[in-house]
């Protein structure tokens, strides 16, 4: 039991030493990288599949008779109105 207690103390001290030196752990590095990549991917996909549908931006394949159709196309219509108002 004493050996495991000493080992635990050594591990805690080593963790504090590395933290004070500024070494980043895997958990601290990955979320920011993953977040940035997912935001870029989402932006690219949204931009890539927007088409002009009678003056209204719709997702690709949503344009029918100069109006947006299918689920989610109304959201793109609202975004295009907000952008045109600016």
UniProtKB/Swiss-Prot annotation:
Q: How is it modified after translation?
A: Contains 3 disulfide bonds.
Can you tell me which family this protein belongs to? Answer: Belongs to the teretoxin M (TM) superfamily.
Domain-level remarks: The cysteine framework is VI/VII (C-C-CC-C-C).
Organism's domain of life?
Eukaryota
Main subcellular localisation: secreted
The protein's name is Teretoxin Tsu6.16
Q: Which positions are listed as propeptide? A: 22-46
Q: Which UniProt keywords apply?
A: Cleavage on pair of basic residues, Disulfide bond, Secreted, Signal, Toxin
Subcellular location, record wording: Secreted
Found, by tissue, as follows: Expressed by the venom duct.
Provide the leader sequence positions.
1-21
Is the Secreted keyword given for this protein? yes
Q: Which GO terms describe its cellular component?
A: extracellular region
Q: Name one GO molecular function term.
A: toxin activity
């Amino acid at each position: 039991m004493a050996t495991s207690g000493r080992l635990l103390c050594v591990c805690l001290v080593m963790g504090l030493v590395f933290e004070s030196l500024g070494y980043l752990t895997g958990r601290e590095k990955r979320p920011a990288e993953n977040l940035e990549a997912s935001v870029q991917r989402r932006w690219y996909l949204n931009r890539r599949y927007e088409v002009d549908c009678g003056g209204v931006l719709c997702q690709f394949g949503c344009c029918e008779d100069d109006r947006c159709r299918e689920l989610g196309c109304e959201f793109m219509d609202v975004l295009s109105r907000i952008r045109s108002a600016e």
